[in-house]
């Protein structure tokens, strides 16, 4: 079976920035890929925290040029929240795939076994993250849109304009 593809339609400062299409590695990380896929479609409804289990309307709260764009905190919006479709947090599935370069999609965490809904898209090779963060997909179209998002980031991670997932889903 082919790996699923999902999309984000991003806005930057309220203006449409374009579509990012990602392939999810369901073949190597089925549980992690399924979590992200379902959070793109919103099909699981409302989570334990009372918020929709959906990336739609959430922001990239941390964008560091030359490193990565991080998002997925749809409960708090600032990097302290998020929730998986499995409940609060889930374990690191495996570290088969590596942080080989721009476009790699990986889970953000707060240490081993703390995966929720936060993720990041690499804008560079980040091999020091291998064995610490689960790589579960890659950007297949729209890396130019990620570059636009990267351009409003800063070394602190704060964005000069909000980068919002205006719409998302499965293709």
Curated annotation (Swiss-Prot):
Enzyme class: isomerase
EC number: 5.2.1.8
GO molecular function: cyclosporin A binding; peptidyl-prolyl cis-trans isomerase activity
Catalytic activity: [protein]-peptidylproline (omega=180) = [protein]-peptidylproline (omega=0)
One cellular component term from this protein's GO annotations in UniProt: cytoplasm
Gene3D superfamilies named among the record's database cross-references: Cyclophilin-like
This protein's record includes keyword NADP: no
Keyword Isomerase assigned: yes
Keyword terms of this UniProt record: Cytoplasm, Isomerase, Rotamase
Signal peptide (UniProt feature, chain positions): none
UniProt tissue specificity: Expressed in leaves, floral buds, growing shoots and stamens at anthesis.
InterPro entries assigned to the protein according to its UniProt record, in alphabetical order: Cyclophilin-like_dom_sf, Cyclophilin-type_PPIase, Cyclophilin-type_PPIase_CS, Cyclophilin-type_PPIase_dom
Domain PPIase cyclophilin-type: 7-170
Compartments, record wording: Cytoplasm
Gene Ontology biological-process entries: protein folding
Regulation: Binds cyclosporin A (CsA). CsA mediates some of its effects via an inhibitory action on PPIase.
Pfam families in the record: Pro_isomerase
Major localisation: cytoplasm
PANTHER family: PEPTIDYL-PROLYL CIS-TRANS ISOMERASE
Family membership: Belongs to the cyclophilin-type PPIase family.
Task of the protein: PPIases accelerate the folding of proteins. It catalyzes the cis-trans isomerization of proline imidic peptide bonds in oligopeptides.
Name of this chain's protein: Peptidyl-prolyl cis-trans isomerase
Biological source species: Solanum lycopersicum (Tomato)
């Amino acid at each position: 079976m082919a790996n699923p593809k999902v999309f984000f339609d991003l806005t930057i400062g309220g203006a449409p920035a374009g579509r990012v299409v990602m392939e999810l590695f369901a073949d190597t990380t089925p549980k992690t890929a399924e979590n992200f896929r379902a959070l793109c479609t919103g099909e699981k409804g409302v989570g334990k925290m009372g918020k929709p289990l959906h990336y739609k309307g959430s922001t990239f709260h941390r964008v560091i040029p030359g490193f990565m764009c991080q998002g997925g905190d749809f409960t708090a919006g600032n990097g302290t929240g998020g929730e998986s479709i499995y409940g609060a947090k889930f374990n690191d599935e495996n570290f088969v795939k590596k942080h080989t370069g721009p476009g790699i999609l990986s889970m953000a965490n707060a240490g081993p076994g703390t995966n929720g809904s936060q993720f990041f898209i690499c804008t560079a090779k980040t091999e020091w993250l291998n064995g610490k963060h689960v790589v579960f997909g890659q950007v297949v179209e729209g890396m130019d849109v990620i570059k636009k998002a990267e351009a409003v980031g800063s070394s602190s991670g704060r964005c000069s304009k909000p980068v919002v997932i205006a719409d998302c889903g499965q293709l």
